[in-house]
UniProtKB/Swiss-Prot annotation:
Species annotation: Methanoculleus marisnigri (strain ATCC 35101 / DSM 1498 / JR1)
Lineage, opening ranks: Archaea, Methanobacteriati, Methanobacteriota, Stenosarchaea group, Methanomicrobia
Annotated site residue numbers, Important for bifunctional activity: G114, W115
SUPFAM superfamilies, per the entry: dUTPase-like
Protein name: dCTP deaminase, dUMP-forming
Positions of the catalytic residues: E127
Length: 187
């Protein structure tokens, strides 16, 4: 079941869902608007192949900055953080969606990482890309996406109880940690 506005507000006020900082005016009929943070990370263009199982290539040739705004050039991909940190209980999951007004500028908010498991705690890393033919400027603090909350049965092993919860407690835009997976698939 998708939570509606009064359910979202009630669960946040009771501490069942934690959102910091919380602005009641960001609650929509079926979602909570989230804002862009100020930490950005991107790959420097080059020929180095990124191997998801090799942390050295994942972390090599990146730049990062903290800024009040950033210009996304056409085709530019970067990671950003949400201003809000969240904490989900073991019976609530969330999905992140871009705001249509931002999408209409050509800015995608996430590539495929739009699911937030029950038990997650931290900021959300956004996988942003400008598919417009023109540069687009985005600002820290601007509403950039929406969280949709779903009530589920209680998870037996919520994200915060998993031994391999790679992104638990992240507090800024975080590069892929795929290399922490137990084994490489057989080639």
């Amino acid at each position: 079941m998708i939570l509606v506005d009064w359910q979202i507000e009630d669960r946040i006020r009771r501490g069942h869902i934690r959102v910091d900082p919380f602005e009641p005016g960001l609650i929509q009929p079926n979602s909570l608007d989230i804002r862009l943070g100020s930490h950005f990370v991107w790959y420097v263009p080059g020929e180095t192949v990124i191997d998801p199982y090799d942390s050295e290539t994942v972390c090599r040739d990146t730049e990062e900055m903290v800024a009040d705004s950033i210009v996304l050039a056409p085709g530019r991909f970067l990671l950003a953080e949400t201003l809000e940190a969240i904490e989900l209980p073991d019976d609530i999951v969330a999905s992140i969606e871009g705001k249509s007004s931002i999408a209409r500028l050509g800015v995608e908010l996430h590539q495929t990482g739009g699911w937030i498991d029950a038990g997650f705690r931290g900021t959300i890393t956004l996988e942003m890309c400008n598919v417009n033919s023109r540069p687009v400027k985005v600002y820290a603090g601007m509403p950039i996406g929406q969280l949709v909350f779903y009530r589920t049965d209680r998870a037996a092993r919520p994200y915060n109880m998993k031994q391999d919860a790679k992104y638990m407690d992240q507090q800024q835009a975080t590069l892929s940690r795929y290399h922490e997976n137990a084994r490489r698939a057989e080639e």
